[in-house]
């Protein structure tokens, strides 16, 4: 028997072994892909609470702003129905950090500070770096509408960031992105809008 004939005879014996192995590897790769990409990302964007009038530049929160911010951690825990916040970002001013602090304390998170130049491209970084996670971003009247529009494609729906409104952008993969507005503040004033 020639050497080529022996090789041909050996190949059919490998097929019953290799074919199931390839099927298992392909299925495992598919499950891994689905597990890492087919998740829903939730980005909650809100403006810092009310700031004091003085000092100009980088003021602390006003007493009303402190009261509004104080309940944010519990409000988000209720809104997420016992879920968790995975990442927390805030602008690098005192008013943004003071608004984020109750959220950080409630969920045991560090506050990742965003310098002025870091807001550009933030939406795409949130989508790619935090897929399948829940992220809270505390911004400014000038940054919240743009970030929401970039995340949700809803440019006309958020003309300016309002006090006591959390913009919830739900990004399912696959599926259509949705935008919700939640009001927060004193007890009894929370409500959802679509």
Which residue stretches match the model-derived regions?
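Short, well-structured beta-strand segments enriched in hydrophobic/aromatic residues
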Residues: 134-136
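Active-site-proximal alpha-helix that buttresses catalytic centers in soluble enzyme cores
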Residues: 2-24, 30, 34, 38-132, ...
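Short beta-strand segments
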Residues: 138-140
């Amino acid at each position: 028997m020639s050497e080529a004939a022996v090789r041909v005879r050996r190949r059919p014996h490998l097929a019953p072994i290799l074919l199931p192995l390839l099927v298992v590897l392909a299925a495992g790769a598919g499950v891994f892909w689905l597990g890492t990409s087919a998740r829903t990302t939730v980005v909650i964007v809100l403006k810092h609470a009310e700031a004091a009038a003085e000092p100009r530049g980088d003021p602390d929160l006003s007493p009303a702003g402190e009261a509004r911010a104080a309940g944010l951690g519990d409000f988000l825990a209720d809104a997420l129905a016992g879920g968790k916040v995975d990442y927390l970002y805030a602008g690098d001013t005192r008013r943004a950090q003071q608004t984020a602090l109750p959220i950080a304390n409630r969920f045991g998170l560090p506050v990742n500070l965003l310098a002025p130049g870091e807001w550009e491209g933030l939406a795409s970084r949130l989508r790619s770096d935090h897929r399948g996670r829940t992220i809270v971003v505390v911004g400014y009247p000038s940054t919240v509408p743009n970030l929401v529009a970039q995340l949700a494609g809803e440019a006309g729906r958020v003309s300016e960031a309002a006090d006591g409104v959390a913009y919830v952008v739900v990004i399912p993969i696959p599926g259509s992105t949705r935008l919700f507005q939640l009001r927060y503040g004193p007890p009894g004033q929370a409500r959802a809008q679509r």
